[in-house]
Amino acid sequence: MKKILLILLLLFLIPLSACGKVKYEFKDGVMYEDGKEATGTFEVTINGFKSKGKFINGLANEIEVYYSDGSIMRKDIYVNGEFLGLQVYYRNGKLMSTYLKDKRMDIFYDDGQLLMRFDKEKGENTVYFENGNPLLVIVGTTTSTLYNENKEVLSRIENGIRLDDDITFKNLEDGSFEIIKNNKVIGKISAYGVPTYFYSTGETLMKLDNSVYKTLFKNGNTFFERDGNITRFYYKDGKLLYESKGKEWTIYNREGEKIITAFDEITDIKKID
């Protein structure tokens, strides 16, 4: 009789244990629990970083991503499950980037100074010097203006035509030209027609290097570069900060880790509440 009771008990326990494991899945922006839209607080791994998010009926309500020391790296903003934007932070707590869906994206230096703003509504992209002055302003696909750190215009192009009436050129013996404005050399054009522009103090600001347009920090390291549809921004020490290729883009921390991409990888899902 005891053996029969033991067998019956095992028969009940086996299906219970088999049913005890819940399957969680994040697919197409929706969190599922055993195939149904989930509600609760979840711990997940996003692009390799520990994260926590709240979901209601499968849709995200808020998501936070953390550095290894527990400090906040990123906050995703949602309203009624719709993704509206995000904020990314440096380890020191300063804002690194903000993104408002279909409106604007900003990237900041680690001291809080604005580095780049892409205004989708205006169709305007502006890159800034560390002192806050504009370095390059691009409007649509037709107009671009390059400045030095003192906000003096070095070059203005509209519809492929230079609009620099106050600029003169001095022919040098090697076939190159000095670009002169207000009796000061602001740049140079090589004998092959390749332009280079200078800071007000003489260091190279912008140059064309093997068909890649590069803007440099005063220390000579690349600040940002553009090669066709590929754009890259760098930290002052030369490490990659931001990269975009068409609709794909990635932001990196100083350790070279991808901390945010256009397509997040979410794994290790665990419900905690």
PLM segments and residue spans:
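Sec-dependent N-terminal signal peptides
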Residues: 4-15
